[in-house]
Amino acid sequence: MGRFISVSFGLLVVFLSLSGIGADQECLPGWSFYEGHCYKVFSEYKNWVDAEQYCTEQENGGHLVSFHNREEVDFVVKLGYTILKADIVWIGLRDFWRECHWEWSNGAQLDYKGWSDEPNCFIAYTVGNKWLRRKCSSTQQFICKARVPH
């Protein structure tokens, strides 16, 4: 009986591993999984354009992080603070044409807002969960978001 339970448990572990239930196993090493996407915090300081380019070079479909609900913001804020112990990171939101037409660097529609009125790129505080506009030429640490690799 003990051998049957042991074998059954072993098969369950193998099945769960292969089916992708093991969270971070769906992302490349160093990336964190949440709701179908992979996230990675970078401690390098870059301006917004260079940070976005760096994200696109990291993984297929990668961009500076975009948010689509409060739960995703909470996950990313916690991830950023845990790794960096810093309070500000670039996010993918920018007024590309300087006409107050805000969109994410990955082309997604802005469907969740969290900022005060102020330049043309956005930072997020990893403490207090606030977004602020900042000059795109200033340098910050950043977080990339990418699709899960297939």
From Swiss-Prot:
Tissue expression profile of the protein: Expressed by the venom gland.
Record carries keyword Disulfide bond: yes
Annotated Gene Ontology cellular component terms: extracellular region
Cystine residue pairs: 27-38, 55-144, 121-136
Compartments in which it is found: Secreted
GO MF terms, alphabetically ordered: toxin activity
Keywords: Disulfide bond, Hemostasis impairing toxin, Secreted, Signal, Toxin
InterPro entries for the chain: C-type_lectin-like, C-type_lectin-like/link_sf, C-type_lectin/snaclec_domain, C-type_lectin_CS, CTDL_fold
Extent of the signal sequence: 1-23
Pfam families documented for this protein: Lectin_C
Domain C-type lectin: 34-145
Main location: secreted
Complexes and interactors: Heterodimer; disulfide-linked.
Family: Belongs to the snaclec family.
PANTHER family per the UniProt record, alphabetical: MANNOSE, PHOSPHOLIPASE, LECTIN RECEPTOR RELATED
Function in brief: Interferes with one step of hemostasis (modulation of platelet aggregation, or coagulation cascade, for example).
Protein name according to UniProt: Snaclec CTL-Eoc125
